[in-house]
Amino acid sequence: MRPLTDEETRAMFEKLSKYIGENIKLLVDRPDGTYCFRLHNDRVYYVSEKILKLATNIARDKLVSFGTCFGKFTKTQKFRLHVTALDYLAPYAKYKVWVKPGAEQSFLYGNHVLKSGLGRITENTSQYQGVVVYSMADVPLGFGVAAKSTQECRKLDPMAIVVFHQADVGEYIRHEDTLT
């Protein structure tokens, strides 16, 4: 477990800023304590200073997980967000997409969101912008990337892809053995 290097921090914050913009500072400067990001086994964990001090008493090879896993670095040093970060991304999301009840199950199985399943979309969402996907009851389901802008979505045919799937809460069941 170690602090992130400058390149790792930059890569992670660039990815997070696609979803929550300037609200990144709200993740670190919280009223309930100081939180930080730490790297362990190529995974980035979001952890309070209090838990971090307790985790230093455990040997590095015995430590499986601590805090909340936000994502991991690939072998090419690109940062990939995990679904475990959804609870922290959803309240601060700048761009949101709501899916109809019939399209929820399809999204939770790992499929993209089609125009026919789109309930609402935040105004001024640009193409390839990171979005958090919600059910119509405002329950966060996952996140993805907008395939089309808000303006283009109005003119699309029903079978066109609106949001590219990246992660969803169904991964807790599909990949339960690899999530830490």
Curated annotation (Swiss-Prot):
Chief localization: nucleus
SMART domains the UniProt entry points to: PUA (SM00359)
Region span, N-terminal domain: 1-92
UniProt function note: Required for proper 34S pre-rRNA processing and 60S ribosome subunit assembly.
Family: Belongs to the NIP7 family.
Assembly and binders: Monomer. Interacts with pre-ribosome complex. May bind to RNA. Interacts with NOL8. Interacts with FTSJ3.
Protein name: 60S ribosome subunit biogenesis protein NIP7 homolog
Annotated organism of origin: Xenopus laevis (African clawed frog)
